[in-house]
Design a protein with these regions (language model features):
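Low-complexity, acidic/Ser/Thr- and charged residue-rich accessory regions of DNA metabolism proteins
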Residues: 60-64, 98-140
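ATP/adenylate-binding site constellation spanning eukaryotic-like Ser/Thr protein kinases
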Residues: 9, 42, 119
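Phosphate-backbone recognition surface of nucleic-acid-processing proteins
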Residues: 17, 23-24, 28-107, 111
């Protein structure tokens, strides 16, 4: 918390508060992701975190189900899985990430599949909110 205040990121941290992200996971996610503006699009942030489906194609063959790429820092994936675990324990019905994971779980998807899909969706929403906030700062 003190790190966030000392860096002048308290306003960003407070505005971007999402379910499952608290006093310890918020700064950890911000530290692991770094400057969000360096990612050109939302798929770049999920690729960096390693929660995007890996490509498996050659010629006319294209696999429908592939493993996660697992590129990027494992600490970031660990923090994302902790956020997903918090979402599953608190069950916030108004959270789009929880609803998405609950839908995947109801479809009978394996644990790692819906946790990884939830982390992917979380990052895409996080990226959008931070970019929107930074754009509003530039407008002022």
């Amino acid at each position: 918390r003190d790190l966030v205040r000392s860096r002048g990121l308290g306003d960003v941290y407070k505005r971007q508060a999402m379910h499952g992200v608290g006093d310890s996971l918020g700064p950890q996610l911000m530290a692991e992701l770094g400057d969000v503006t360096r990612f050109t699009h939302r798929n770049a942030i999920t690729a960096f975190a390693g929660v995007d489906p890996g490509a498996d194609q050659s010629g006319t063959h294209e696999a429908k189900s592939t493993r996660v790429s697992k590129s990027g820092p494992p600490e970031l994936r660990r923090a994302l899985f902790l956020v997903m675990d918090c979402l599953l324990k608190t069950m916030p019905q108004d959270d789009p990430v929880y609803r998405f994971m609950d839908k995947k779980r109801a479809e009978g998807k394996p644990y790692l599949v819906y946790m990884t899909a939830g982390a992917n969706k979380f990052l895409r929403i996080y990226y959008g909110r931070v970019k929107e906030y930074l754009a509003s700062l530039e407008g002022n």
